[in-house]
Amino acid sequence: LMGVIYSTLAIAPVQFDREKVFRVKLQDEKQASILKNLTQTIELDFWYPDAIHDIAVNMTVDFRVTEKESQTIQSTLEQHKMDYEILINDLQEEIDKQFDVKEEIAGRHSYAKYNDWNKIVSWTEKMVEKHPEMVSRIKIGSTVEDNPLYVLKIGRKDGERKAIFMDCGIHAREWVSPAFCQWFVYQAAKSYGKNKIMTKLLDRMNFYVLPVFNVDGYIWSWTKDRMWRKNRSKNPNSTCIGTDLNRNFDVSWDSSPNTDNPCLSVYRGPAPESEKETKAVTNFIRSHLNSIKAYITFHSYSQMLLFPYGYTIKLPPNHQDLLKVARIATDVLSSRYETRYIYGPIASTIYKTSGSSLDWAYDLGIKHTFAFELRDKGKSGFLLPESRIKPTCKETMLSVKFIAKYILKHTS
């Protein structure tokens, strides 16, 4: 009997043998509509932009397709003389290649590797044990599947001070994002009293860090489907699972009719803040609004530093200020390994998005909100090899420290 029960529970992980990732450069309207038409009959998983309705002329589009459909795609692209390349020839091979750093000690958490959720949970406990005067863990809520949502507060325990809220892993498959949040907490706590800048920052401000926003989705991307993006909530009247948490915030939530299909990876959910994860974060930020002066969210991939707005091409009142911070922050980032980032408002730099955490935080009154799209530019996409984690974290750390110094000096 146990065998029967077990086999129904254990859905085998999705295999991606010989699936391909294409990159297509769209020259004109005709080519854009050819690509859009393909999606009527073939299921494409968009890597960049996030969804079919974001496609526009002169855009470079990355998407994943099954081995079976890749022939059709290729012949259509060639027939219409479209400019394309195959970024990834065998997705499963690329997935296996991510883990290119040897474990020092089997089963132990490592900053040089991707860590699954269980390792991250025990890591949060260890950080508090190791730095009790500097790190505390706050449970801000739980997920649909009843996993805890933990924020780590870093900073001196006494008194009210300015704060920065940071989150990672709102999209499950963007693994390098939670890796950065872990690195940040580790570096901040460990360098207090040793590194001059970090010590000054932590003496005068707090950091609230949510290492994994979309815990259920993250677990699912480890155990069942590496390409999963959304959370894992059930949708009424649909067999399709999950909401895109970064379309679920109460800011211009219903302005994009294209995000109301539960089967899409950018599904906005049945209502603004319908998701437990979103609600936990918004409640926490609202209750600390007096102190939170900046909000930073980490995604991958494409090497960009973005700021509001996403839902409109209108520029926010402090646009010049945000532009200046982003310009210097990307300069600082490139000083380490010459990694080039582009920067600008979401809507004009990439495409319009509605219901995002960034715009929500800004309209709530947090006047410095930024989204990092971490490495790379598409060679590995979401499957950045582990050997790139540390360089990515080190360069991003410089950038975040600059933003924090700026916030300390220039906000009231």
Curated annotation (Swiss-Prot):
PROSITE patterns: CARBOXYPEPT_ZN_1 (PS00132), CARBOXYPEPT_ZN_2 (PS00133), PEPTIDASE_M14 (PS52035). Residues 1-10 form the signal peptide. The gene is Cpa3. Binds 1 zinc ion per subunit. It is found in: Cytoplasmic vesicle, Secretory vesicle. GO terms for molecular function: metallocarboxypeptidase activity; peptidase activity; zinc ion binding. The keyword Hydrolase applies. Its main location: cytoplasm. SMART domains: Zn_pept (SM00631). This is Mast cell carboxypeptidase A. Keywords: Carboxypeptidase, Cytoplasmic vesicle, Disulfide bond, Hydrolase, Metal-binding, Metalloprotease, Protease, Signal, Zinc, Zymogen. The active site is at E373 (proton donor/acceptor). Residues 113-407 form the Peptidase M14 domain. Zn(2+) binds at H171, E174, H299. Belongs to the peptidase M14 family. Gene3D superfamilies: Metallocarboxypeptidase-like, Zn peptidases.
